[in-house]
Amino acid sequence: MDRGTWIGNGNAAEKVSLTARDDVLGFPGFELETIQGTVMTVCDFYALTEQGFVYAGRTAGYDFDDAAEGDGAWPLDLTGDGRSELITRSTFGDGMSCVFVYRWNAAEGGSQRSEVDWDKADAQLARLSAPLGVTARAETYHAQDNTVTLTLYTESGTKETTLPLTTDVLGEWSTE
């Protein structure tokens, strides 16, 4: 995917780019990317459905276009229904990241969002949270092998586990 044309010069407080995407929740669509300030990137995704353009999902962060982690959004059919979900990685101001998954809900004509449920994904790691004095949690998606790494930062060190990203480790689906 090539980036679209940027609107705004190098010193602009905000830059905007519009990029066509072949697969947004199984539909053609586009990504509206804005760089806010000097480092914060926000990407909103829209799918061209039977109802017209519909909001599909979002990713935001400080380290997009990172060679190791990618651009923050990946289409992949996680549910096995033949339609791709949109997997996104958002990085927050404290440096911690979270993985969100968006899917198309045909009955409601819109997207739904879910995220990794730590209790489902790794009950042992989730149980360590309280006794170890957790200072932060992070999730990193690895598109090359469709895995997610859960990292628990504690007062006594870092604990992490990597497992396949499947619908079995996701929480409830909610409408944006």
Annotate each PLM feature.
Residues 15-31, 75-81:
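Acidic, divalent-cation-chelating loop motifs in proteins
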Residues 35-176:
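Acidic, small-residue rich beta-repeat scaffolds with periodic aromatic anchors
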